[in-house]
Amino acid sequence: MEQAGTRPAATEHPRLRRPMPWLLLLPLLLLLLLLLPGPAASQLRYSVPEEQAPGALVGNVARALGLELRRLGPGCLRINHLGAPSPRYLELDLTSGALFVNERIDREALCEQRPRCLLSLEVLAHNPVAVSAVEVEILDINDNSPRFPRPNYQLQVSESVAPGARFHIESAQDPDVGANSVQTYELSPSEHFELDLKPLQENSKVLELVLRKGLDREQAALHHLVLTAVDGGIPARSGTAQISVRVLDTNDNSPAFDQSTYRVQLREDSPPGTLVVKLNASDPDEGSNGELRYSLSSYTSDRERQLFSIDASTGEVRVIGGLDYEEASSYQIYVQATDRGPVPMAGHCKVLVDIVDVNDNAPEVVLTDLYSPVPENATPNTIVAVLSVNDQDSGPNRKVSLGLEATLPFRLNGFGNSYTLVVSGPLDRERVAVYNITVTATDGGIPQLTSLRTLKVEISDINDNPPSFLEDSYSIYIQENNLPGVLLCTVQATDPDEKENAEVTYSLLEREIQGLPVTSYVSINSASGSLYAVNSFDYEKFREFFVTVEAQDKGSPPLSSTVTANVYVVDMNDHAPHILYPTSTNSSAAFEMVPRTAPAGYLVTKVIAMDSDSGQNAWLFYHLAQTSDLDLFKVELHTGEIRTTRKMGDESGSTFNLTVVVRDNGEPSLSASVAITVAVVDRVSKILPDTQRHVKSPRTYSEITLYLIIALSTVSFIFLLTIIILSIIKCYRYTAYGTACCGGFCGVRERSPAELYKQANNNIDARIPHGLKVQPHFIEVRGNGSLTKTYCYKACLTAGSGSDTFMFYNTGAQTGPGPSGAQAAVTDSRNLTGQSGQNAGNLIILKNEAVSQNEPRQPNPDWRYSASLRAGMHSSVHLEEAGILRAGPGGPDQQWPTVSSATPEPEAGEVSPPVGAGVNSNSWTFKYGPGNPKQSGPGELPDKFIIPGSPAIISIRQEPTNSQIDKSDFITFGKKEETKKKKKKKKGNKTQEKKEKGNSTTDNSDQ
């Protein structure tokens, strides 16, 4: 039986029972997660200064929330920007949970001048679910200087303003907030003004300029002040504004005359208008307060007012009536000067006029006729004017004579009371266009009376002057790649003639420039003389040319003159640098090798580039843009040499990737880059390229190897065949001319060191003296290359060789005195094959010595292959310059490098490329490793040497020195398989040749 108040349990439908856990439990679970403290819901606050670089760390959100990212799994942590700011200033590193700056934040642009600048973020984590609010406050830095609304303020203050007057000045604005905003103002020192600051509101002040001392415009009409606003940042920033105070004038000064009393004398026959005196008064005020008006004061009598007047503006006192000495001998005139101020002020003076008694009637000159203008080519005695004279006096006072200035090209011819004015000299309108001829008439009275008459005679023009240019020549500089029609220059010619005789037209004289008429390059405006470019100029095609401009007037006949306009095409930076060495093929990096034992400063290679531009546009600068190890390599800025900065160690990698950028000095700058792979090896024999980078497939690799083997075999065969043929030719020449030349070697007596040093210079100079008894293919090379070393070589060339590659070998002889620390440099072999004069950095000297009669040594049949050369069959092996001078006990000698495939030690010599400017990569030399180098005495040769174009090392043997003959070294060729019997036979032949030759000597000076 059921209890009261209870209800039977309702039966639930099965379909409604299933979704209950998801519909009811999920909202409850989310609400519980939001209410519970801990990592599920929290708020983080960070602060970061503005202007931080992208990537700057703000904080680690995962660590602050206690989340382990390794348990969350990928993609379980993300960040939302509340308010969707654009751009996204902050980002979250999903791997470490670090919150970092994504883009540069400018607080002033983001929040303007709000006290707090916040970025609100939301961090969401899944499994377990966590929602965290993140507030990042952007802190202000003092990155803005105070700035006034206007840089200059103009104030106008009357000099009557009393001290204490105030003038409002606009305050400065600073986008920063807090202490970084404007804090103080400073005013430059002034005895008249001071600055008063009144607080207006928070971080805002009212500026007032206060007058503390009265102004006087007459002492200083303009005052310059500097107002400075300083913020409170560390370091403080400031901004300035210029304040110019102009003092306005008030009428506080009276006019004053130069003298209080003026005394003058005046003839009684002075006609009306005669100037009595010119008065001058001054007023230090300005404007209307300083403008003066002259007048006769009330103290002047009416009679004097009838005889004299004064000009109100100029102060000139003139006669207006007839004067008579018998009536009055003197007059007193009172004059006042009044300014035009609001309250006019006046100054006074007195003029005393004394009348001088003279003859009352002066002669009168009457112009009867005037023939003007007169042509400038008028002949002498041409009549210009007809004059007559009259005098009211009688007797001797009536007799009048006329006169002219003696310097005028005119004269007077008189008959009775009439005169004619005629031409007496040459006229030139360009020198004097108008003559104001003053005719003087004098009577015979006592005292004599004189009157003047001025005649204006104009000279008419004839075309007697050609146009004249303002400049002797014009120099026009125009940048290349100009637009057609651009104005080059305006030539101007003047013609001192007038009217049509002075109208000038311009034209170009016909001539050809590079086979084209001048009008194909330049046109001219016939009226203005403006020269225009017809086409675009190219500096690389031609750099300058000239045109001849003719100026011609329109006279009859026309006259003309010419001037030369030189047009110089100015180079533009329109060519990027071109990298000559090292070069890469098939978009692969150039390959260089460095031994692991290389010391600091080791020369890895040298980047050689050129620029087709000129001047500073062709100045090249080398930069290391990218490298695997930033502190292991460096590149010289101007030479392009890549060197090691420290000693290679075991910790160094096996290969390094370098990117060298070459920039020119143009505007804008152009650049080129080259990628270089540097391999670090223990020994030269281990130098192998990274074939995995460049070989695309085994088939391609096998094809390249096959082609390389065929090419090397062909070159070796041709080289050996050439050596044999040349040896036969030299032996034949020896028989024909009696010189010591056999076995591919020519002997010449060695010069003294002083001679070698004296003949070294910076220009290529090949000299073959008359009667030189030496083979023309034996030369000595001295010069300075692009490297920072000095070189000296002797080259033995084969007769008739068509190759542009020289083989240099060392003599071991003393080099002679030279600059301290001089080192060897490699010369481009192309400069030694008939192209002298094209490279100003080398010197070629042909020895002018007697031919040595010593018997040459026999070849040594010892050929050895180098492991590095075997590696060179698979890659491009570049070599480095060598031949460093060393001071030995007997004077300067040279260290002889050797290379042997059987030498495993790191001290063995290494093969490096010659990397100087203009160096042919086929010329190979050697460089010692960092270990103990082989010390060779004077006259010694290395045991082995590399033949260009052949993968072999040639043994160089040296016979013991003999006191009766010169030291000789020979390069011998042969194979290891030759028998000792063959050697003995050759030595026997050599002994027999010594007996025949006698005292012949050989000079071995190749390096």
Curated annotation (Swiss-Prot):
Residues 730-1007 are cytoplasmic. It comes from the Eukaryota. GO terms for molecular function: calcium ion binding. Glycans are attached at N280, N436, N586, N657. It is a single-pass type I membrane protein. Residues 43-148, 149-257, 258-365, 374-469, 470-579, 594-691 form the Cadherin domain. It holds the Pfam family Cadherin_C_2. One of its GO terms (cellular component) is plasma membrane. GO terms for biological process: cell adhesion; homophilic cell adhesion via plasma membrane adhesion molecules; nervous system development; serotonergic neuron axon guidance. Residues 885-1007 are annotated as: Disordered. SMART domains: CA. Residues 966-980 have a biased composition (Basic and acidic residues). PXXP repeats lie at residues 856-859, 889-892, 930-933, 948-951. The keyword Chaperone does not apply. It is found in: Cell membrane. Residues 43-708 are extracellular. Potential calcium-dependent cell-adhesion protein. May be involved in the establishment and maintenance of specific neuronal connections in the brain. This is Protocadherin alpha-C2.
